[in-house]
Amino acid sequence: MLFKRGTNHVQLLRPAVVSDGIIRLGGSAVEFYKQLFQSRIDSEDVMKFVPASGAATRMFKRIFEWIEEPEKHANEIAQFFNRAEELPFFEQWMSKVNELDIETFKVGLESQVKWLRILVSSDGIGLALLPKGLIEFHQYDAHVAIPVEEHMHEALGYAKSGDLCKLHFTVSDEYIGSFMAKVDELKKESPFNEVQWEIKFSSQEPKTDTIAVDPKLQIIGSNENPLTRPGGHGALLHN
């Protein structure tokens, strides 16, 4: 079994550095390739490919540990809440807290744990259940952007051929509708409404999923119906 045998790792000789594996382009070379790209892009079929099927579970892993053993992590939790109001999704979070009539997190550890549950659970705003592409991520002066929006901005910079900008997102089946709705909403806003968009979505092939095992390498579930998780590197080559 692969879990027991392991995989063959690449044998690294040394780190890549400038002049040994890495070429550093000078000012004139940078300008040359920049102009070459700009002169060719309108005649090429360019698409930006974005793997966006990852859930935010690992992003909030630490918070689940805090909720499980709050007394053990009281200092970490306190430090987190010292700057919680700087988080880009704080307004969304606080709105849900107010809706549920929860006391301020400044009361102490018990209230802080309530806030944390609201942050990650389905009873609250459930950010740990969402794909990272739909989470409020970047705070600007008068605007909070999600990663999908940032990828659209980036595509305008280097993936626009003529008046057409192409994007392809890989997302989980569960959230394709949410992604499509958000993209349709963004396309109506400036500067996205100044170009034509061709945005497509696909899902990761189930046949690339990895079988889950316990610490003793026993399959979780049954041989006929094992528990699987989406595969990692290389799983999106088909997409």
Indicate where each model-derived feature is located:
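Polybasic, low-complexity association/targeting segments
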Residues: M1-Q11
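Domain-scale recognition of functional cores that engage charged ligands
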Residues: L12, V17-N239
